[in-house]
Structure formats: structure tokens, C-alpha cells
């Protein structure tokens, strides 16, 4: 496609596609800067790119938020141009043989909580927290985690009046089944607590390699989702976090103790993991597991190589600083062509649900993928036409408790479904919850496989060549 976007962004090769449209590498012909260009047909039944671009504009300036370069209509396409980013955490998780060390998880947790907190301070929920939606930067930003994919984002309060959205039930499950909170499975309107609970599942996924509700078998997709929900509700926090530091139990207990409109104490959650990090004797040197795999000599000076990977070192006397300088020199020698081939932009790892059964069958075949991808207004957005029947559940209240440590509610609500201990309380008289759940791709399906079809070399390997570290 020989096209110049907005008069200055020239399209390069295609690096991804899906129900949302197509993704291309691009270059600013005026500055030579590489960018990511996302195209969506103007004829699509449920356009979402305009909505997503508005969220990008509202979130601009935040650490770990890609810059929106341009949005508009070009020919038959809605077009959004943003920063080009590196591999997703799911890609790096796979690169590290599907298990991350405690040190790496704790370094990630600090940034991940910050990203979610920033989005909440701007008045929006993410509602699809998963490894695919967090990407590492490139070059000097290679240690920075970026949050992407705001297609399911929803405004949860008015920034002027601070009025919180009302508590509701019987909501369709929105997000990705594997990481969705218990209350989301039960059909409760999502709020800040649900983004944080989902983040907790992501951390346990990294530490343990899988979650207890993965790999469940069922005759239909609806039955599969019901089994995921039942398993998640029935799994005590202590079992979920077995053989892991107690701080993770505390994290989940806190998230599940929050009432619907409570403001979480993000500082408390970050402090939990920071204190654990210090107690373990780790150094916050940004030497992640994938860094040690790529540059084993760095692990010898990170002060924690024995806890991360037991790699042999090529030069035990090499300092981390010297390694970083060497790594930057290597990255500096990359040609523009290799950088284009190696970098994978944020949105190529999205697996959004579509509005029709035809689109879903083409882009989603797995049960753990995103379940809804229709852009809402400030209220609820249109849902999928997918119908798998209804699953009735009763709302489950927890016992009464004092105010959360996070501070006052935006408007006190007594509605909570999960007890602070992670168990399930007595069944209430609330209406049953009906969940119509879309089909989706496995979150672990990496978009790198799509990009690899367009190039002879492994794009993840080239993307990792670009990762440079900085203390």
C-alpha cells in the first residue's frame, strides 16, 4: 500500500491484522522517526478507532502511555498513528520459557500498578488487563512498561463532580476470561478494584506459569466460561498463591475487600512488593529475566542472578554499567531496516472481539481471549451479538467490614460479592446474573507469529536486539 498518512507518515510493511483492522510500520518522512499506523475501514460495522484515539488524547503525558501522533480519515480508512513499541509481556514471558523470577515480577509489578493508577486518576477503567496489553519500550525506553489497548476503557466517574458510576448487576462479561475478576464473572459492573484484581492474576500467571482455571475442558464455549468462573470463585486465595510470598495473598485480600466505589490505596499495594523486594536482597537494576537470557554477563553483576536464572557468565568481572553501554552500542548499529523488522508495535498483540459471528470465527478461536470489544460512550457500549445462553448466578455479599485502607468511597456502596478472605459469602436476594460471553483468542497467542510470516527472521529475536537497559 503506497500511501502517505496525514501528509507525512509513509506506510511500511504490514506487521499485524485482526478484526480491528490492520497494523503497519510507518516512518515520518520529515524526521525519519519510526511509528505504528493502525488502519480501520470506515465501513466497519462497529468502528472503535475514533473512541480509542480520544482515550489516547485524554491520557497523553502519562508515563508509559504511547504518544498519539495523528488521527484522522485517509481515503477509506480511519487512521491512528502512535509510538512504535517493543515486545509485549506475553511475548517476553514466552521467550523466558513461560515462567518469570520473583525479582522480575516485582520490578514489573511496581510499574504495572503505576500504569493502572494513572489511568484511574484520569477517570477511566481499562477493563482488559492482561500481559498482551503491556509492552516494553525500545532504545532508551526499553525498561519502561507501556499500557495499551484502550478499546474497552470506560469512564467510571466524572472528573468535575467526582460522581462514580452506579452499581449494577447482570452485566455482560467484558475483558479476558483468564484474568477477569470474580465480580466481573458474576456480572457486576466493573470498577477500580477489578482492574487491580486482574493485575494480581497476571502477576501469579508470571510467577507460576499458569493459572488453575487454564486448560479446563467443556462441550461448548459457554460451558467453558462457566467452568472458568466456577473454578476461580472456588479457588481460595491461599491455594492460588501457594508457595509464593505472603504479600501476594495480602494483595488479593485487599483487592477483594474493596467496595464497588472505594478508591484503592495504590501506595499500600506498591509498598507490599517494594518491601518484599528489599527483604529478598534484590537490586532494582532493571535486569529482567529476558535481559539475562540475552546478555548472560549482565546477570553476574545484577546482585540477583542466582535468584533469576543460574546462567553462567562470559565475563564475571563485567559490571552492569559496562554491559549497558555495550548493549546501547549494539542497538546503535542496528539499521533502519532491521529496526523496522524487529520492533513490534503495541496493538499487534490485540485480539479484539468483533461484532459478528463471522468476524469472531476468523479472528478468535480460543476461550481465554477478549470477550467484548465494542467502544462505549460514557455509559455502556453496544455488546456482541454472540449468544451462548445465560448463566444464572446470585450476587454474593461479603460480611461487613470497616472502610478500606485506600481512603473514602466516592459514594458509599454496601455491595460487595467477594469476601475479604477470598471466600464466598451467603447467597443474597439479588437478581440472577446473565452473562453473554463472546468467543476469544488465547491471550498467550503472540502476534509475533503473524509478523513472522512477513519476514524470514524471528521478529521477537530482532525486537530483543533493540532492548537497551538503563539504571
Swiss-Prot record:
Residues 385-430 have a biased composition (Low complexity). It catalyses: L-seryl-[protein] + ATP = O-phospho-L-seryl-[protein] + ADP + H(+); L-threonyl-[protein] + ATP = O-phospho-L-threonyl-[protein] + ADP + H(+). Residues 325-339, 454-464 have a biased composition (Basic and acidic residues). It is an enzyme of class 2 (transferase). It is found in: Cytoplasm; Nucleus. Residues 9-278 form the Protein kinase domain. Coiled coil: none annotated. Residues 431-449 have a biased composition (Polar residues). Autophosphorylated on serine, threonine and tyrosine residues. The active site is at 128 (proton acceptor). Pfam families: Pkinase. Its EC number is 2.7.11.1. ATP binds at residues 15-23, 38. The keyword Nucleus applies. GO terms for cellular component: cytoplasm; nucleus. Keywords: ATP-binding, Cytoplasm, Kinase, Nucleotide-binding, Nucleus, Serine/threonine-protein kinase, Transferase. PROSITE patterns: PROTEIN_KINASE_ATP (PS00107), PROTEIN_KINASE_DOM (PS50011), PROTEIN_KINASE_ST (PS00108). GO terms for biological process: signal transduction. Expressed in leaves, stems and flowers. Residues 300-471 are annotated as: Disordered. Belongs to the protein kinase superfamily. CK1 Ser/Thr protein kinase family. Casein kinase I subfamily. Monomer. PANTHER family: CASEIN KINASE-RELATED (PTHR11909). Casein kinases are operationally defined by their preferential utilization of acidic proteins such as caseins as substrates. Can phosphorylate casein on serine and threonine residues, and poly(Glu,Tyr) in vitro. This is Casein kinase 1-like protein 9. The gene is CKL9.
Amino acid at each position: 500500500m503506497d500511501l502517505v498518512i496525514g501528509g507525512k507518515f509513509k506506510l511500511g510493511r504490514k506487521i499485524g491484522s485482526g478484526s480491528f483492522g490492520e497494523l503497519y510500520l510507518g516512518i515520518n518522512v520529515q524526521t525519519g522517526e519510526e511509528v505504528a499506523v493502525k488502519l480501520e475501514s470506515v465501513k466497519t460495522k462497529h468502528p472503535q478507532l475514533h473512541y480509542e484515539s480520544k482515550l489516547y488524547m485524554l491520557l497523553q503525558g502519562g508515563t508509559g502511555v504511547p504518544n498519539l501522533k495523528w488521527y484522522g480519515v485517509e481515503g477509506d480508512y480511519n487512521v491512528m498513528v502512535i509510538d512504535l513499541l517493543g515486545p509485549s509481556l506475553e511475548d517476553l514471558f514466552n521467550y523466558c520459557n513461560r515462567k518469570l523470577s520473583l525479582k522480575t515480577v516485582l520490578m514489573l509489578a511496581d510499574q504495572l500498578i503505576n500504569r493502572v493508577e494513572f489511568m484511574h486518576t484520569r477517570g477511566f477503567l481499562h477493563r482488559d488487563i492482561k500481559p498482551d496489553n503491556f509492552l516494553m519500550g525500545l532504545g532508551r525506553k526499553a525498561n519502561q512498561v507501556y499500557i495499551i489497548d484502550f478499546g474497552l476503557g470506560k469512564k467510571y466517574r466524572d472528573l468535575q463532580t467526582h460522581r462514580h458510576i452506579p452499581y449494577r448487576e447482570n452485566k455482560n462479561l467484558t475483558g479476558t476470561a483468564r484474568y477477569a475478576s470474580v465480580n466481573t464473572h458474576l456480572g457486576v459492573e466493573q470498577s477500580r478494584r477489578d482492574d487491580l484484581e486482574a493485575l494480581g492474576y497476571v502477576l501469579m500467571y508470571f510467577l507460576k506459569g499458569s493459572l488453575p482455571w487454564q486448560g479446563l475442558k467443556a462441550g461448548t464455549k459457554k460451558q467453558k466460561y462457566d467452568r472458568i468462573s466456577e473454578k476461580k470463585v472456588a479457588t481460595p486465595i491461599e491455594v492460588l498463591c501457594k508457595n509464593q510470598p505472603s504479600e501476594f495473598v495480602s494483595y488479593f485480600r485487599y483487592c477483594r475487600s474493596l467496595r464497588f466505589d472505594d478508591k484503592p490505596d495504590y501506595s499500600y499495594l506498591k509498598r507490599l512488593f517494594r518491601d518484599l523486594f528489599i527483604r529478598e536482597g534484590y537490586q532494582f537494576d532493571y535486569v529482567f529475566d529476558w535481559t539475562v537470557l540475552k546478555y548472560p554477563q549482565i546477570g553476574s553483576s545484577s546482585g540477583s542472578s542466582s535468584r533469576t536464572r543460574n546462567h553462567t557468565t562470559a565475563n564475571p568481572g563485567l559490571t552492569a554499567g559496562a554491559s549497558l553501554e555495550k548493549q546501547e552500542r549494539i542497538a546503535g548499529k542496528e539499521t533502519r531496516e532491521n529496526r523496522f523488522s524487529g520492533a513490534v508495535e503495541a496493538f499487534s498483540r490485540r485480539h479484539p472481539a468483533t461484532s459478528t459471528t463471522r468476524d469472531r470465527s476468523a479472528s478468535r478461536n480460543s476461550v481465554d481471549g477478549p470477550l467484548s470489544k465494542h467502544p462505549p460512550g460514557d455509559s455502556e457500549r453496544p455488546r456482541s451479538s454472540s449468544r451462548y445462553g445465560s448463566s444464572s448466578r446470585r450476587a454474593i455479599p461479603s460480611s461487613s467490614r470497616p472502610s478500606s485502607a485506600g481512603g473514602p468511597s466516592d459514594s458509599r456502596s454496601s455491595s460487595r460479592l467477594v469476601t475479604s478472605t477470598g471466600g464466598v459469602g451467603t447467597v443474597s436476594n439479588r437478581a440472577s446474573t446473565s452473562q453473554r460471553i463472546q468467543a476469544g483468542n488465547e491471550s498467550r497467542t503472540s502476534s509475533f507469529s503473524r509478523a513472522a510470516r512477513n519476514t524470514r527472521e524471528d521478529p521477537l529475536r530482532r525486537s530483543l536486539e533493540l532492548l537497551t537497559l538503563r539504571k
